[in-house]
């Protein structure tokens, strides 16, 4: 199963450098903290609609080429992050199989738990970069994060109902 928002997410084109942005957009797109937490600060109940969680081969995560280690399998998680039931963000997480050892194995068992609830409680979380992307009408971003030095790639597309707009 897929979702049209995930097709748009995969179509994002990334800027080579951070573009000039209105302060409001910049505040959302370059947020270093948890997007889940930011949505909750809007006074909303945040929930996850799980679209897909599975191991996939390299051909299904081509956008990660050059950003993650080359491996035979990756854990792929695709979700909609909803605020009071309304989709605000489409998310796609690509995790190399080698990252899934030790405590990071929990990434395979998040189910309907927002990724941010796990990531941003870890004292071992670091972020290598944030890249800003855009399709015809929507903004997005991707980040390479590390847990205990082990990488994962998180891509987020802000949907029309999101307070980013």
From Swiss-Prot:
Location (main, coarse): cytoplasm
Protein keywords: Cytoplasm, Lyase, Pyruvate, Ubiquinone biosynthesis
EC number: 4.1.3.40
Location of the protein in the cell: Cytoplasm
Pathway(s) it belongs to: Cofactor biosynthesis; ubiquinone biosynthesis
An annotated GO BP: pyruvate biosynthetic process
Taxonomic superkingdom: Bacteria
Sequence positions that bind substrate: 35, 77, 115, 156
GO MF terms held by the record: chorismate lyase activity
Keyword Lyase among record annotations: yes
Reaction equation(s) it catalyzes: chorismate = 4-hydroxybenzoate + pyruvate
GO CC terms of this entry: cytosol
Enzyme class per UniProt: lyase
Pfam families: Chor_lyase
NCBIfam families: PRK11655.1
Assembly notes: Monomer.
Alphabetical list of PANTHER family matching this protein: CHORISMATE PYRUVATE-LYASE (PTHR38683:SF1)
Similarity-based family: Belongs to the UbiC family.
Record function comment: Removes the pyruvyl group from chorismate, with concomitant aromatization of the ring, to provide 4-hydroxybenzoate (4HB) for the ubiquinone pathway.
Name of this protein: Chorismate pyruvate-lyase
Originating organism: Salmonella arizonae (strain ATCC BAA-731 / CDC346-86 / RSK2980)
Taxonomic path: Bacteria, Pseudomonadati, Pseudomonadota, Gammaproteobacteria, Enterobacterales
Gene responsible for this protein: ubiC
